[in-house]
Amino acid sequence: MKRLISCLTIICALNRSAAAETTSSPCSRWISLLKPVCQRIHQTWTEGHDDMYFSGYAWHNRYTYRPEKIKSYNEAAWGGGLGKSLFDEKGNWHGLYAIAFLDSHRHIEPAVGYAYLKTASVNKDIKAGLGYSVLVTSRVDYDNVPFPGALPWVALFYKRTTVAATYIPGSAGAGNVLYILGKISL
């Protein structure tokens, strides 16, 4: 619960910080190489829709874990979070999020990040996307020390709802988890 409150506090602090910047030059103090990154994040935060995330499943790859280990893992990765997202001028999706969920050992794992998806429209209401997410998370097995990560991300959009998935790579007995989550744009 503390981690969820921490994630929500970070979002509120970012909101206050974004509001304090002038809209004409929100990224003026950034180096020129990173200004486009700052500008896209700022645009997502200020123009994006509010999102509610929910998670519920983490599949551990049966080819990399022993059956008795699989039985000991939690695959009901219940959790949720908040975010902001938008489709840009090219129709691609950008999202900022803060979530917390139960990890494989039933410990709360928070994550804060940015995701980008190159999308293709199937029809007016359905889009499919493929991209990545960069994030900061912490885990009990790493002494709750925050660490960065980058993961592949796929999604299927239907009107205001989204089903997304990422694969956490690893080695035999570590990682190799398909994590599935959903999003509703409010």
From Swiss-Prot:
It catalyses: a lipid A + a 1,2-diacyl-sn-glycero-3-phosphocholine = a hepta-acyl lipid A + a 2-acyl-sn-glycero-3-phosphocholine; a lipid IVA + a 1,2-diacyl-sn-glycero-3-phosphocholine = a lipid IVB + a 2-acyl-sn-glycero-3-phosphocholine; a lipid IIA + a 1,2-diacyl-sn-glycero-3-phosphocholine = a lipid IIB + a 2-acyl-sn-glycero-3-phosphocholine. It is an enzyme of class 2 (transferase). GO terms for biological process: lipid A biosynthetic process; symbiont-mediated evasion of recognition by host antimicrobial peptide. Disruption phenotype: Mutant is impaired in stationary-phase survival in low-Mg(2+) medium and shows decreased resistance to different structural classes of CAMPs compared to the wild type. Mutations reduce both the numbers of bacteria recovered during intracellular infection and their cytopathic capacity for U937 macrophages. The mutant is also more defective for lung colonization of A/J mice. One of its GO terms (molecular function) is O-palmitoyltransferase activity. It is found in: Cell outer membrane. The record marks 69 as: Role in lipopolysaccharide recognition. Belongs to the lipid A palmitoyltransferase family. Homodimer. This is Lipid A acyltransferase PagP. It comes from Legionella pneumophila.
